[in-house]
Design a protein with these regions (language model features):
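Conserved dinucleotide-binding and phosphotransfer motif residues
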Residues: 32-34, 98, 131, 191
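Hydrophobic anchor at the start of a short beta-strand
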Residues: 13, 34-37, 102, 166, ...
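Small-residue (primarily alanine) positions within well-ordered alpha-helices
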Residues: 18-21, 25-30
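Predominantly flavin-linked oxidoreductase catalytic cores and closely associated redox partners
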Residues: 51, 118-119, 123-201
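Short beta-strand to alpha-helix junction loop
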Residues: 79-89, 106-126, 175-183
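Beta1/beta-strand and adjacent pyrophosphate-binding region of the FAD-binding site
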Residues: 5-21, 37
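Glycine-rich active-site loop/strand segments that organize a redox cofactor
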Residues: 56-104
Length: 201
């Protein structure tokens, strides 16, 4: 969807970033009855997700919960309750609910049965749209104005968005050509938000 130049939009919730984290945030908002608007600088959704699919799309790992959570090192205590709620079994159920069967490879990794990302992404987007999620592509987030409104550059001109809640799902600093350039670190620093330096995963 495109908005008129210098236009303003008011939303309940904005998700900035249309990768897997942003889509999952939009899904959670929609399931809670919140109207979600997803903004992304790219022309289409899930660019890195589709790139990952070229290697078969490793969704998760099927090992038991204890060794699985131990792989998160110092963060395992923090992440254990989250992985109990949405760990490997739930990821597989989520994919199956979207009509995508999965299998466990010889390494224990979990893949879509057809080893492709596109069918899963298409089904996910169809589900999100049916739940009322709206997508605003080619909208590059440029920061906040003096009143705290979000600012975007769009093909039709600059727009300002007021939102009651904002989820930043902007990715790391890799694959700048796919939208993950780490520019958001400077924007957060300007607003006094402390961040940790980006590190390879």
């Amino acid at each position: 969807s495109h908005l008129a130049p210098a236009s303003a939009l008011a939303c309940d919730a904005v998700v900035i970033g249309a990768g897997p984290a942003g889509l999952m945030a939009a899904q959670a908002l929609a399931q809670a009855g919140v109207a979600a608007h997803v903004f992304d600088a790219m022309p289409s959704v899930g660019r890195k997700f589709l790139l990952a699919g070229k290697g078969g799309l490793n969704l998760t790992h099927a090992e038991p919960p204890e060794p699985f959570v131990s792989r998160y090192g110092a963060r395992q205590t923090q992440l254990a309750p989250l992985l109990e709620q949405f760990g490997a079994p739930q990821v597989r159920s989520w994919a199956q609910d979207l009509g995508v069967e999965t299998f466990i490879g010889t390494s224990g990794r979990v893949f879509p049965a057809d080893m492709k990302a596109a069918p899963l992404l298409r089904a996910w987007l169809q589900r999100l749209r049916s739940q009322g999620v709206q997508f605003h592509m080619r909208h590059r987030f440029t920061g906040w104005d003096g009143a705290g409104a979000l600012q975007f550059q769009a093909p039709s001109g600059d727009i300002t968005v007021q939102a009651r809640a904002v989820v930043l799902a902007l990715g790391g600093g890799s694959w700048a050509r796919l939208g993950s350039d780490g520019a958001w670190l400077a924007w957060l620093a300007q607003r006094g938000v402390t961040t940790a330096p980006l590190q390879p995963s």
